[in-house]
Amino acid sequence: MEMKQISETTLKITISMEDLEDRGMELKDFLIPQEKTEEFFYSVMDELDLPENFKNSGMLSFRVTPKKDRIDVFVTKSELSKDLNLEELADLGDISKMSPEDFFKTLEQSMLEKGDTDAHAKLAEIENMMDKATQEVVEENVSEEQAEKEVETIGYVHYVFDFDNIEAVVRFSQTIDFPIEASELYKNGKGYHMTILLDLENQPSYFANLMYARMLEHANVGTKTRAYLKEHSIQLIHDDAISKLQMIEMG
């Protein structure tokens, strides 16, 4: 297994067929998302010594490209939380019901109403950010594998969120109305942390960032990685945390 940093925001992890076999994985396992695939991603991330600028990212995207003799896993960190003022985002209303087009239109109007003369430039930066990770993966594949037939690319995104108390965790869980591939709940000191894995198959390129923005309405940006939480925290719910917490009725 080899890791290469191809940009400030993207890592490329190459895993041979022998490594896959040793982990009990086959190429077909990546075509239909399942718990086995989730654990594969987590185990790879736990083993690797990630660069410092990746260790504190609250959102990591996984994109898998199977090849004839290996798979390439592209891991991209998002800088969305640094590019958007979350207080301004909260002023936009219920973005969970907005289409992507309405989201950008509302954000632009909010900037203009606040006298932001750079509103259009900021919108362009946000849109470019959402396309950047996908473009990096495409360019890397084209430059290295022009003569090689590609198999369908499958993507996943992994988030970590922080909460001050268990009530906040339950309220967050009850706002989730879209499919979650996997979720875990940890306790570290007085705080709580949740990991979430989403499947990006058949989703538009902006889906991961839009879901991240929606969830940040009810959560704090993650300050720990899953590897750190597994080693230093108490795991309260091992799997399907969202569904289990949704069964709790708040008084």
From Swiss-Prot:
InterPro entries: MecA_C_sf (IPR038471), Neg-reg_MecA (IPR008681). The N-terminal domain probably binds unfolded/aggregated proteins; the C-terminal domain interacts with ClpC. GO terms for molecular function: protein-macromolecule adaptor activity. PANTHER family: ADAPTER PROTEIN MECA, ADAPTER PROTEIN MECA 1. It comes from the Bacteria. Homodimer. Enables the recognition and targeting of unfolded and aggregated proteins to the ClpC protease or to other proteins involved in proteolysis. Belongs to the MecA family. It comes from Streptococcus agalactiae serotype Ia (strain ATCC 27591 / A909 / CDC SS700). The lineage of its organism: Bacteria, Bacillati, Bacillota, Bacilli, Lactobacillales. Pfam families: MecA. This is Adapter protein MecA.
